[in-house]
Amino acid sequence: MPKLNSTFVTEFLFEGFSSFRRQHKLVFFVVFLTLYLLTLSGNVIIMTIIRLDHHLHTPMYFFLCMLSISETCYTVAIIPHMLSGLLNPHQPIATQSCATQLFFYLTFGINNCFLLTVMGYDRYVAICNPLRYSVIMGKRACIQLASGSLGIGLGMAIVQVTSVFGLPFCDAFVISHFFCDVRHLLKLACTDTTVNEIINFVVSVCVLVLPMGLVFISYVLIISTILKIASAEGQKKAFATCASHLTVVIIHYGCASIIYLKPKSQSSLGQDRLISVTYTHHSPTEPCCVQPEEQGGQRCSAQSRGAKNSVSLMKRGCEGFSFAFINMY
């Protein structure tokens, strides 16, 4: 039912971490800022290495570079305002700024989903059809696949942002989160949001279930091909090229599915925040981990090993923070 005699909202306030004590907020600020800087530097290192080393000018590393760029933009869309909110918890955000944040969050988040799917297809072609790999995964095809992923992200984001901010927001202006998210914004609308929730669910299915299904099919075919390899060493190398990508896929789609595909009745504010904190800080560190071993068994360069060490540090920090967050919530 629409709410009558209400004033339309022009700005929102994030509830974020307002329930925590000030000393806890300062600890979170230091941890988040450190992880944020490590994330940015780690992605820049990866992009620089791929750009400078001509041996890495392959489809696999092209998509890795695109994923690093996308993850960097995704992180920049969320974390800076969250850090500001930890120091100034009562800082409002204008509806236009909230819409902008949601747009970039959705664009690059959805782009990440489809880039991971494309990377799975790349591994499928490399292992199941190696003789035609260079023909199928040519420069033009790689650019088209990367552009298609971004195009889908832009299209889905426009649909979602237009759907959400076409609603009236009256009286209620406190978002029970630390960034502008579709599910939490819909709760503040002073009108029926059934259609919007259906749109959100359909988009979530298209962005999560469909890519997950494609990745699953790719890996079924990949595993069946690997098992046919006579050499145990050959099987090991083939599995190694896919293991890190598969790990990232499970974490990425797993966290996103828990947040966006579960029924509204099972939505838990504390659980959503915990998963979102882990997701937004953990996922951006992962592109650097999707570095399959060279099929020829060559060792990574010193720069690549350094980048991986930085990522390991980031992942340990994220895991430690998540544990602390659970205990303090």
Curated annotation (Swiss-Prot):
Residues 48-55, 122-140, 219-238, 294-329 are cytoplasmic. It comes from the Eukaryota. Glycans are attached at N5. Disulfide bonds join C98-C190. GO terms for molecular function: G protein-coupled receptor activity; odorant binding; olfactory receptor activity. GO terms for biological process: detection of chemical stimulus involved in sensory perception of smell. The keyword Disulfide bond applies. GO terms for cellular component: membrane; plasma membrane. Residues 1-26, 77-100, 162-198, 260-272 are extracellular. PROSITE patterns: G_PROTEIN_RECEP_F1_2 (PS50262). Its main location: membrane. It is found in: Cell membrane. It is a multi-pass membrane protein. The chain crosses the membrane at residues 27-47, 56-76, 101-121, 141-161, 199-218, 239-259, 273-293. Keywords: Cell membrane, Disulfide bond, G-protein coupled receptor, Glycoprotein, Membrane, Olfaction, Receptor, Sensory transduction, Transducer, Transmembrane, Transmembrane helix. Belongs to the G-protein coupled receptor 1 family. Odorant receptor. This is Olfactory receptor 10J3. The lineage of its organism: Eukaryota, Metazoa, Chordata, Craniata, Vertebrata. The gene is OR10J3.
